[in-house]
UniProtKB/Swiss-Prot annotation:
Description of activity control: Uridylyltransferase (UTase) activity is inhibited by glutamine, while glutamine activates uridylyl-removing (UR) activity.
Name of the protein this chain belongs to: Bifunctional uridylyltransferase/uridylyl-removing enzyme
Keywords of the record: Hydrolase, Magnesium, Multifunctional enzyme, Nitrogen fixation, Nucleotidyltransferase, Repeat, Transferase
Family, per entry: Belongs to the GlnD family.
Catalytic activity: [protein-PII]-L-tyrosine + UTP = [protein-PII]-uridylyl-L-tyrosine + diphosphate; [protein-PII]-uridylyl-L-tyrosine + H2O = [protein-PII]-L-tyrosine + UMP + H(+)
Source organism of this protein record: Mesorhizobium japonicum (strain LMG 29417 / CECT 9101 / MAFF 303099) (Mesorhizobium loti (strain MAFF 303099))
EC number: 2.7.7.59, 3.1.4.-
Length: 933
């Protein structure tokens, strides 16, 4: 890659800075120990630091050089520290004739020692002494440190003599690494040279294997802490998998183990090819550019690439929007491809550690505890061997000789449960050019791939290895297009390719029964889907394969499936099944979460999509995999319950079990069942209570819940309470039910929703019923927060009391919402176009209003308030959030119980809802005007 001119002289003039600092002591004959001189020096250093950083940021924006920026910032700090040391030694703690003990070397260590700094990086310094500390040394160090701290810098420091450094480095890997990266800054050069010479001979020379083990273990621990996946959509640029620290770890090990000082020497040692080392440099430069931009933009040492800065950094780096992919999505795709390259380099490097040239290094065979290499033949092949419990290549021509071996490597690894030897993965990565049209159409290659995909051992792991090695995207070019692709959304936790691979893992988990308690229905259906098993696995792998294209990804994905599946060896029938599943993979999830499942029209419409019980079963399992594979915390028991309800209702209709009895007859039967269940009530009370409820309540609410409601209302009436709440926890469904009894009024649901927001409750569903005596019996479901029922019940009762306080006027809703809520981090950077639709074809009895927009605290309360102002009667509400996006659906009628069919009225409703979504306050008299229309 082209070398960028550093232009270091434009950042800071060290000599000029010294002259300016010295000039501050003119009035005191060169004495800089006074408070005035110190204040002047501090002000001067602050100005030069700010100027230098501003110039470095401008240069980064101009040339985009990440390494160059890090080197410039390091040079800026070098000059400041050198000038500060000279000032302290010359003007503050002046000693005419220093003793041999009054010597010091200022040494940059750790990251700063590499000569690279991010704007918010720690400044790690070693004050190196020849012997014990002296008063002069102690005062000088203290002066420098306090000045650096007053500059707002985070300084890590140690004051040690050479013997202490060596003794501590033998037992502390962190100290050993910091000295490994040590760089002389200022002072006595001989002290630094002696330290480095003795460190190399007394520590490094005899501890290579131990150091390698420790750094690799440290890397694994760091990944676990920062996020194990390389494809988390808010990655940690410094410590995450595929981040800067991984590259630095490779270089540390290289310097330590191969005794080199520069990266170029690793090419000379045969560790990397020249092309691979260029990849190393490009990856490092890109990651440094991203990290420096992050620090400049946030004004702090921010290491996680949060959503709220991704868009700005994409703009700074010059990314533009292309059809199907926004600028920020293109930037993040590049980021994840770089992270993947870092993974490739890591595998190649680990392979090099085990290659022949490394065995000449003393102690190499002790790097890994099991490194006595035990090789044996692998049954069924002469191309691969088992090398120390890992599958390896028999020779370097394995893939060249027969490209199908690229697939056989993974097939044999899966069959025998073997890990991969780094040599095999290194050669595979270097052989990806062998994947061509002929291999993609090869019958055996496709059979092997299908076996790997549908394996009952560990398909997820092998697919991830194939993907990280680059084979999966080469084998299926359409899959290659979504490798490292992120979706700029708070809902999606992983890149598209990682999501698909995780979905395969969920499917295997369902089939094994590992998650039977989480999704019992899906698990129970799997044995009956054996004939369609291959089609199901392929559909799960391909369902998002067309993401990032301008057209609808479900329809485009179906076309891709019809083209790919025959080459995989699927029959025409299975190919069509896969295509149908891909095209409709969102249908069940969206229907379950955004429609009223008690409305027969919902079930009829969904049944017309699936048309058969077999497809219904397949779509349910795919839907579960899709939601579970999005990321932690997305799946919950409530979503599972919605899917099960939709499944059972649709299955009943498809098998002819749906009753054709008239609504009036069913209402009469339900009323009779309720009366019979209340047989122990006095006749007068029973007749009165049963007569309170309208048909929608009787046909929608299960009898056990009707009986709970009856006792609840009876107790409230006996106590003379016009306002009451009742709670019930649902552990398996992960929701808590709160029933509210109150005098009916138009804004009731709006007030309840606002109270829930103020109490920290997240409403996921609501059923609204009125009684013949003018009361409302509303049931809301809120997301569960606690594991133990006792804790959740106490929390729900607190929410219930808050609802009562708001409805009775004891608490003021706007103040409570403002006090108890704040927007999700990063939500403000997302742009969700607001949408409001009023449709009369989704229900036979209700108009269905669907709104979509950017979620914010109190939005549900605002929307329901708007609907009430529009004189609409809400029968049910279904609330769904996808990260920063909310989709709320309301089943409504006008105040006479009729659908909204006037075009003018529909337009008014839509305009008011759009204004609410956009945060525009309604005009005065809006309610009266809307009602008149």
């Amino acid at each position: 890659m082209a070398k960028i001119s550093l232009k270091l002289d434009e950042l800071i003039d060290g000599e000029a800075l010294r002259r300016e600092m010295t000039a501050l002591t003119t009035a005191t004959a060169g004495d800089g120990s006074g408070a005035a001189a110190r204040a002047g020096v501090l002000q001067l250093l602050k100005a030069r630091l700010a100027e230098g950083r501003k110039i470095a940021e401008a240069m980064l924006k101009e040339d985009g050089g990440g390494n160059a920026c890090a080197e410039r910032l390091s040079h800026l700090m070098d000059e400041l520290i050198r000038a500060l040391y000279d000032f302290a030694a010359t003007h503050v703690y002046r000693v005419k004739n220093r003793s041999s003990a009054e010597r010091m070397a200022v040494v940059a260590v750790g990251g700063y020692g590499r000569g690279t700094l991010a704007p918010g990086s720690d400044i790690d310094l070693l004050f190196l002494l020849p012997y014990k500390q002296t008063p002069w040394g102690e005062q000088t160090v203290e002066y420098m440190l306090y000045m650096l701290w007053d500059l707002g810098l985070k300084v890590g420091h140690a004051t040690r003599n050479i013997d202490e450094c060596l003794r501590l480095s033998r037992t502390d890997i962190t100290i050993r690494t910091s000295i490994l990266e040590a760089r002389f800054l200022w002072g006595e050069r001989k002290l630094y040279d002696e330290l480095m010479l003795r460190f190399d001979h007394e520590v490094v020379r005899t501890t290579g294997p131990e150091y390698v083990q420790a750094k690799l273990a440290e890397r694994d621990e760091r990944h676990a802490k920062a996020g194990e996946s390389r494809y988390l959509v808010e990655p940690n640029v410094k410590d995450g998998k595929g981040g800067l620290r991984d590259l630095q770890t490779l270089f540390w090990i290289g310097k330590y183990f191969y005794r080199v000082r520069t990266g170029e020497e690793l090419v000379e040692k045969g560790v990397f090819t020249e092309a691979e080392y260029r990849e190393f440099q490009k990856a490092e430069d890109f990651l440094w550019a991203v990290r420096c931009h992050m620090h400049f933009l946030t004004g702090k040492a921010e290491e996680r690439l949060h959503f709220d800065i991704q868009r700005e950094i994409a703009e700074r780096l010059g990314y533009t929007t292309h059809p199907g992919l926004s600028a920020v999505e293109r930037f993040m795709k590049h980021y994840f491809l770089v992270a993947k390259d870092v993974g490739d380099l890591t595998r190649i490097f680990c392979a090099a550690l085990e290659e022949e040239q490394a065995k000449h290094v003393p102690g190499f065979n002790r790097i890994f505890l099991t490194f006595q290499r035990r090789k044996r033949k692998l049954a069924g092949t002469s191309d691969f061997i088992v090398d120390n419990h890992r599958i390896n290549i028999a020779d370097d021509q394995v893939f060249e000789r027969d490209p199908v071996n690229l697939l056989r490597l993974f097939w044999f690894a899966d069959k025998h449960g073997l890990e991969f030897h780094p040599d095999a993965l290194k050669l595979l990565t270097r052989s990806l050019g062998l994947v061509n049209k002929s291999l993609r159409r090869d019958e055996e290659a496709n059979r092997l791939f299908l076996d790997i995909l549908t394996s009952d051992r560990n398909a997820e792991l092998n697919l991830r290895r194939m993907n990280e090695a680059g084979l999966l995207g080469r084998l299926i070019p359409d899959f290659g297009k979504i490798v490292a692709m992120m979706q700029f959304s708070m809902y999606h936790h992983y890149t598209v390719d990682e999501h698909l691979i995780r979905c395969i893992g969920v499917l295997a988990e369902i089939e094994r029964g590992d998650g039977e308690k989480v999704h019992p229905l899906s698990h129970s259906l799997m044995p009956g889907l054996k004939k369609s098993r291959e089609a199901l696995y392929v559909a799960v792998l391909l369902h998002d394969i067309a993401k990032g294209r301008p057209e609808d990804h479900s329809e485009a994905g179906a076309r891709i499936a019809r083209r790919i599946c025959p080459h995989m060896g699927l029959s025409a029938a299975d190919t069509e099944t896969v295509a149908w599943l891909v095209e409709n993979h969102l249908a069940m999830s969206m229907t379950a979460q955004t429609r009223d499942l008690n409305d027969r029209k919902t079930i009829e419409d969904f049944a017309s999509i699936v048309q058969s019980v077999e497809r219904l079963k397949l779509l349910l399992v795919l839907t579960v995999c899709d939601i579970r594979g999005v990321g932690p915390g997305v799946w919950n028991g409530w979503k599972g319950q919605l899917l099960r309800t939709l499944y059972y209702e649709t299955e009943l209709l498809l098998t002819g079990g749906f009753s054709e009895v008239s609504r009036a007859q069913r209402t009469a039967a339900a009323r009779e069942r309720l009366a019979e269940a209340l047989a122990d009530w006095p006749d007068k009370d029973r007749k009165r209570y049963v007569g309170l409820h309208y048909e929608n309540y009787l046909l929608t609410v299960d009898l056990p819940d009707q009986l709970r409601h009856a006792e609840f209302v009876r107790e409230a009436d006996a106590a003379g309470k016009k306002l009451a709440t009742m709670v019930k926890t649902h552990q398996f469904e992960a929701v808590t039910e709160i029933t509210v009894l109150a005098q009916d009024h138009p804004r009731l649901l709006s007030v309840i929703a606002g109270a829930c927001v103020g109490a920290g409750g997240n409403i996921v569903d609501a059923q609204i019923f009125t009684t013949a005596d003018g009361r409302a019996l509303d049931t809301i479901l809120i997301s569960r927060e606690f594991d133990r029922d006792e804790d959740e019940r106490r929390r729900a009762e607190r929410v219930g009391r808050l609802i009562e306080d708001v409805l009775s006027g004891k608490s003021w809703l706007p103040e409570m919402i403002e006090k108890r809520t704040k927007p999700k981090r990063g939500a403000k950077v997302f742009k969700i176009p607001p949408r409001a639709e009023i449709r009369n074809t989704l229900s036979n009895r209700f108009s269905v209003i669907e709104v979509e927009g950017l979620d914010r605290p109190g939005l549900l309360s605002e929307i329901t308030g708007t609907l009430s102002d529009l004189s609409l009667d809400i029968a049910s509400a279904h609330i769904t959030t996808f990260g920063e996006k909310v989709i709320d659906t309301f089943y409504v009628t006008d105040l006479t119980g009729q659908k909204i069919d006037s075009p003018a009225r529909i337009a008014t409703i839509r305009n008011r809802l759009m204004a609410t979504l956009e945060g525009i306050a309604p005009e005065r008299g809006g309610k009266a005007k809307a009602a008149a229309e």
